[in-house]
Amino acid sequence: MEKKFYELPELPYPYDALEPYISEEQLRIHHEKHHQAYVDGANGVLRKLDDARENGEEVDIKAALKELSFHVGGYVLHLFFWGNMGPADECGGEPDGRLAEYIEKDFGSFQRFKKEFSQAAVSAEGSGWAVLTYCQRTDRLFIMQVEKHNVNVIPHFRILMVLDVWEHAYYIDYRNVRPDYVEAFWNIVNWKEVEKRFDDLF
């Protein structure tokens, strides 16, 4: 059976589609260079593990799995990231339907949710992500911070929306002013996609 490897996906929109909030230059470098680096990194670890297993060689499993988690986490989180954004004339605003009802239930209001998610993004230490998740055991929405990319599958939690707050995600457009980038993000949130991710869980 042939073994498969990761490939860089195409974006669901042109590189200039998120302007003026994310420039074409910023998005192109983020996708073609940084996301590609996680693809290459993950595939490199997989090949190293494959070779060691085929040849009966020893491998530092702890180091290999940490490196694999980092690169696969980066690969997967970026898939969510590209998908939960879109052109400002089609996106932004507030969610509808079941997701809106759960935000009201769990946070009190959309404005309260937006404030807490923004605070999570701005306050993430160093490089990381703000993530909206859903816990099936408690039937609740959760906001989480992810350090770097080292996130593995957490049972009963499903990722709904992510915001990349690594500096490579915004430095060309916003320099070191992360709060401005976070505020701009709300203009390009693709709520239809986030709603679909949530509805698909029921």
From Swiss-Prot:
Its cofactor is Fe cation. Destroys superoxide anion radicals which are normally produced within the cells and which are toxic to biological systems. Transmembrane segments: none annotated. Homotetramer. GO terms for molecular function: metal ion binding; superoxide dismutase activity. The lineage of its organism: Archaea, Methanobacteriati, Methanobacteriota, Methanomada group, Methanobacteria. Its EC number is 1.15.1.1. Fe cation binds at H30, H78, D164, H168. Belongs to the iron/manganese superoxide dismutase family. The keyword Nucleus does not apply. InterPro entries: Fe/Mn_Superoxide_Dismutase (IPR050265), Mn/Fe_SOD (IPR001189), Mn/Fe_SOD_BS (IPR019833), Mn/Fe_SOD_C (IPR019832), Mn/Fe_SOD_N (IPR019831), Mn/Fe_SOD_N_sf (IPR036324), SOD_C_sf (IPR036314). It catalyses: 2 superoxide + 2 H(+) = H2O2 + O2. This is Superoxide dismutase [Fe]. It comes from the Archaea. Binds 1 Fe cation per subunit. Keywords: Iron, Metal-binding, Oxidoreductase.
